[in-house]
């Protein structure tokens, strides 16, 4: 069964167009504008933990990357007091290959998404506490000895993509014509 899941993950990597793996477009960056920061929450499933990719390490690495990129980080309390409830959710999932041909391989996905409170324009009485307004996903396959490095690299690239979008959405443009 795991052999088929690994094969499916490889096929998914090959067949998914690059623009489907991320939703970072000019038209949706405005949803990051004025958030005032994000609370970072990480999730890693048991197979990821078993190959050395722990939720705690991912949380620390993610926060370091975001701070270095000058993205404001919120505590959980600050996030709950913010009307947007801005959360950057990082989810890592792994499938460990078993049997002929898949033994020693690990298929993985790294998902980074911004969730925030949203209100329906057609009826302001309807609000959603967790609407995904920005996301990016990376998928890959690595040998069990290299999965931690591969996952960390994909996470870094994905977080840098978010940081760029966030900073650009929250940087005021100079309207003075450079004077």
Regions found by a protein language model. Name each.
Residues 1-5:
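Positively charged n-region of N-terminal signal peptides that target proteins for export
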Residues 6-16:
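Bacterial N-terminal signal peptides
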Residues 69, 79-133, 141, 145:
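Surface-exposed short loop/turn segments
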């Amino acid at each position: 069964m795991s052999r088929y899941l690994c094969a499916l993950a490889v096929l998914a990597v090959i067949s998914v167009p690059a623009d489907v793996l991320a939703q970072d477009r000019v038209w949706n960056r405005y949803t990051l504008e004025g958030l005032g920061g994000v609370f970072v929450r990480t999730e890693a499933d048991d197979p990821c933990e078993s190959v050395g990719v722990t939720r705690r390490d991912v949380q620390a690495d993610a926060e370091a990357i975001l701070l270095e990129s000058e993205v404001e980080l919120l505590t959980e309390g600050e996030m709950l007091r913010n009307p947007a409830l801005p959360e950057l959710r990082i989810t890592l999932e792994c499938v460990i290959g078993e049997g002929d041909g898949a033994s020693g391989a690990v298929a993985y996905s790294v998902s980074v998404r911004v969730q925030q409170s949203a209100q329906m324009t057609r009826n302001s009485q309807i609000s959603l506490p967790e609407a995904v307004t920005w996301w990016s996903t990376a998928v890959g396959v690595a040998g069990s000895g290299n999965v931690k490095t591969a996952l960390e690299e994909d996470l870094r690239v994905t977080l840098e993509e978010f940081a760029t979008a966030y900073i650009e959405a929250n940087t005021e443009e100079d309207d003075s014509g450079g004077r």
